[in-house]
Structure formats: structure tokens, C-alpha cells
């Protein structure tokens, strides 16, 4: 599904902007494009020319989990508004996989939405998400960090040294405490497992951009703590 930019952004702090508008913007560079530039300028150019925000199930699952987690912590209802739950067992031809024409058309209709799409059961599903939420709710540290926070502020600014227009979208900001939190979902949350993910996926690049965005836009005067 193609994203069409419906809002023109300028430097500043934005609340509750549409995620598709955020990603469709090409005037400002995000950490995703910077990660490609680290590989090479050819990777960077290819990303800018060909990035069509192809839907990936693990991105949908991660974003949907963030919404569910923040709903639990802050008594909101963003998950119901932003997430579509479907059941693969309800496909027209249950005895066939999604290579069949009917099943393929059925799934294509479901995918034609701006909402995050999550399966009812399976590995990346509502079933899995409920277990993760129960674990988080029982953790006092997580509760302390996530309750009464601002979720997904979008920050746009121009870097003074390079003149580049940059953007970032921290998951959680505790503005009064000058704390930034980026929620990550992973299969192995052990220190070594997460460390490998952080290195392989360049999490520090994203973290630096999030902290810099908070400072440059004036959202925070200092960053006291940053959490993954």
C-alpha cells in the first residue's frame, strides 16, 4: 500500500501525527536512512529512491505491542483504534495455504489498511502479546518508567553543523524527568541476546538521534537517562 504524504512538516515537536505521514516525509532524514548511509552512499541513495515502507509483520507486531503496553500502563485505548486483529483459520480455503488464489485475495483485502495487522494466534500474535503484557505489568520498574508518559512525540529539526534536516520519534518521553525510553521486542531478552540485536540493528544510532532530537527541538534541556 503506497503512502501519500498528507502533511508538510517543518522544524518542531508534533503530537499524535499519523505514522504513515511521518514515514512518507522525504524532507527529513530518520535513523533508518542514516543506518543505510553508514553502509555506503549507494545504500543510502537506494533507500531514499526505493523505500516504500513495505509492510513487515515484525514491525506491525512491535508497534502493536507498544500500543497495547502503553494502553495498559496509561489506561488508554490506542490499540483498539490502530490495530486490526485477524484469524488465519478463517481464510476461505482452510485446507490450503496462502498460495491459493482465494486465500491470497482474502489476505490482500485484510492487508489493505493503514492499521497494524496482528494474527490472533501464533508466534507474533495477540496470544503472544498477552503473555508479554502480563510479564511487563508484574514488573515494578517497567510500571514506574511507563506510567504517566508521553507516547511517540515526533521531532523535526535542522542540524546546525551539517544543515541536514533530521527527524526522530522516541517511543516514550518522561519530559518532567528528562528520560527517553525506546521499547524493543526481541526473541532473546538476555543481556547477551539483546546486546547482539543492539549491535546488529544499530540501536545506538537510533538512540543518539532520539536524544539529539529531544535536545535540539527543546523538548528537554538535558537527557538524564535513556532506556531500551
Question: Where do the protein language model's features map onto the residues?
Answer:
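Mg2+/Mn2+-dependent nuclease catalytic core
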Residues: 147, 153-228
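Metal-dependent nuclease catalytic cores that hydrolyze phosphodiester bonds in DNA/RNA
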Residues: 1-167
